[in-house]
Amino acid sequence: MEKKLYKLKKKFLIILSLFFIHSSYGKDEIKIGISTFLSGGAASSFGIPLKQGLEFMFNAINEGKVPAPYNTPGIGGKKVSFFFIDEAGGATKQVSEFRNMVQRQKVDVVMGYISSGDCLAIPAVAEELKQLTILIDCGTPRVFEDASYKYVFRTGPHAAMDNIAGALYLKRKGITPKKIAAINQNYAWGQDSWADFKGSIDIFFPGTSIVSEQFPKFLSGQYGSEISAMMVAKPDLIHSSMWGGDLESFIIQGATRGLFRNSKVFLSAGDHVLPSLGRNMPEGVIVGARGPHGDLAPDTELANWFKENIKKELGIKMTTQPMHKGAMAALFLKKAYDQAIKENSVFPSTEDVIKFMEGLTWDTPSGPAYMALGNGHQAIQAMALGVTAWDKKEKRAKLIDIEYFKAECVNPPEGIKALDWIKGGFKGSNC
């Protein structure tokens, strides 16, 4: 009997020791679930590059290879454990996947979301579950303009600056549009982008005529009728915030029919299709990258390290905005957690680290970023625009004739909605 009890006791102790080993191991990691497009038309030029940027930066963080001040291994001293899910499927599906990551997979942080529709759906659930959530890319200003959140942050600026800078670029270059057409995807991102650009044009170029407004369905892929309508209207400037596979298709179809020869075109967020289109990318197109990313990135140690090393690792010729956006989000986490430990000497709870995230300023491969809006939950940064050209030596499409705009020049002050700020004549802007 005693022998049997001894064996049971020994077995129990082994199981108990394994439990503590597992628990200890779990405490040495920070677990992150990430949603990005892994399939469909938004994947190849946007979702996958975002994944690559995050993978590269998290791996570099784990190995302590990021330049100072990020050169200590891990986030808050913990190894980063991360996985990806597919953002394809719509907002309802993403809400379900979000709950699964939080309630079943027990993540410490949720990150990601490219679609503005998804970004409008996720925050309420994050607040309900008290889950720290980092929105990486989506551009609609409505996220923090229409509500306030405790557990949600957005590390990328919203779309207003893309379009304000677009109008300012025209003014700086002496381009005075008389007739403008627009083609934007028919959901929050496209609608908000066009409203911001149209409002900015009204201020800088009063009297300009809007001759065609096209809102094709997201992921439509075919734009023959929209292109025909714009060509008939004969605009001297075309605005588009389209992105991903939609933008690739529009450019190829429009170029074939001479759209880019007859009108100046402004693509507010178009840099990410330059690698895939290559020689098929028309020259002379004004292009933004939702910030100073890729060819538009500043000449800093961190920016150059990131661009050189990720290009080498992936065997690519240029970086694009989704890669930079992923890196920005990863470094935001590291800066906040590291700062919390530096001041408190213990790994912070979610409630504690939020205090360090609010209003945070951090350096990125795209220059400094500031949590300046949304009660310290919405980032702003500088903006840059360039013009497409073919580089014969590098054999790639690139951006030249670059203009930079300070963050305070193209982003509204705290507490003011972007469109209201635009309509009010950009009061308080610092250009």
Over which residues does each language-model region extend?
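Extracytoplasmic ligand/sensor domains, especially the bilobed periplasmic-binding protein
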Residues: 52, 92, 107-215, 262-288
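N-terminal secretory signal peptides that target proteins for export/translocation
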Residues: 1-8
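Hydrophobic h-region of N-terminal signal peptides that target proteins for export
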Residues: 16-25
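Solvent-exposed, acidic/polar segments of extracytosolic/periplasmic ligand-binding ectodomains
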Residues: 30, 361-431
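Extracytoplasmic "Venus flytrap"
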Residues: 33-57, 61, 86-91, 114, ...
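Beta-alpha junction/loop-to-helix N-cap segments that form part of ligand/metal-binding clefts
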Residues: 29, 45-50, 64-145, 155, ...
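Extracellular/periplasmic ligand-binding modules, especially the Venus flytrap/periplasmic-binding
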Residues: 51, 244-247, 294-360
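Immediate post-signal peptide segment of exported/extracytoplasmic ligand-binding proteins
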Residues: 25-34, 71-79, 171-178
